[in-house]
Amino acid sequence: MGIIRIRGLLAPACCALVLALAPVPVQADTVLDWNAVVLDVIRLMRLTPPMASRELAIVNTAAFDAVDAASGLPFQPYHYDGAAVADASPRAAAAAAAYRVLSRLEPGVAARAPALAARMQALYERDTRGGAPAASLAAGIALGEQRADAIMALRAHDGFNVSPPPYWGSAKPGAWRPTPPEMAPAMLPQWATMPPWTLRSPAQFRPPGPPPMNSGKWAGSVNMTQALGSAAGRARTSERTQIALFWADNEGTETPPGHWIDIAAGIAAARRLDLVDEARLMALLSTAEADAAIAAWDAKYAYAAWRPITAIGEAAASGNTEVTPDREWKPLLPTPPFPEYISGHSAFSAAAAAVLARFFGGDRMAFSARSDTPELRAVVRRFTSFSAAAEEAGMSRIYGGIHFHFSHLDGLAVGDAVGRYVFDNFFQRQAAIATSVSAP
């Protein structure tokens, strides 16, 4: 894997307002273009990774069901039991679905970023006012809006916006408790019990838990993070520092799920996928990412394990003499305010890698990725396989000092299981179905 620097490369981490000023493409990759808009909205609204994964999944399942129905139902719908709609424009259906979801879920975009709102409107008009007869466009708009409303209704009471009591953890050795500097309660405990998009339950692929604190495996992982993840960085190479920052995807960026959406969109554009395949790819990927979030949060709150900054500072309480306590130790990256085990980055990345490998016919593929971290906007990292990128993304959290190696490995296992399950059980090709001439 090499690193190249491209002078003048547009920074994906620029604020949504700036990104929204880009001209609307003449050649319409409708699903990919709308996913780019969703990423801008995620940046603008500073969504957390679980929140971002939910928004991406709502947009993409709505768009997929709309495109699928308008294209003769070649694939299993996600949440639609009607007939195919032969007279509907698939492109208009996709645009109407995406536009309606974003307009309803994020009504504050227009006031906070008028340029982004204008871009959304321009994309909508591009895809709904030409390229097909007026009746077909109207049918597509109606279909897309209906599918958007159906998905939003399906997820309206999934608990995303509940306000549970503050989760402060425990002072027990090994247990999570607030971390400096904010010392805030744990974020989004409700995500651990959210109804999944595809899984039978949040705990379907629950991992075994952290190793015992008196074990060599636990000590080895703590020592690895203590050495490689320190803010001082004496044992960390410059490339590993770059990797930690490259995949950081902190608040105000596209987030880890969005990073993989961006990677997939680049590959899909290069492969010139048709509209149905674009919609299916993004539906597969976004639901896998959404369920990876739920599965990861299930594990995080089932085991409620302490973060490295706590474990290293209070290592004496572990009873493991193979670890040296250091209360002055600080991580390279800010510690996220929720339990450590498992690594969400590893779960998100492995789920994406599993979906992409199956969709494109194998794990090995040469592709590049960019970062939303502002100081790395001119850096492109190249990979030869999806699994290699997932491995690097997960290891980035160890280099950043906020995860342990066992959490990375178990996060990869959970994410891979989620991605395989989604691909094998949803959005499958089906036999030809009789079409209808009217929108449901």
Each language-model region and where it sits:
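Bacterial N-terminal signal peptides
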Residues: 11-22
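Sequence-pattern detector for short linear motifs
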Residues: 8-10, 57
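N-terminal secretory signal peptides that target proteins for export/translocation
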Residues: 1-7
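Bacterial Sec-dependent signal peptides at the C-terminal "C-region" and cleavage site
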Residues: 21-29
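Acidic/polar surface patches and capping/hinge elements
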Residues: 28-440
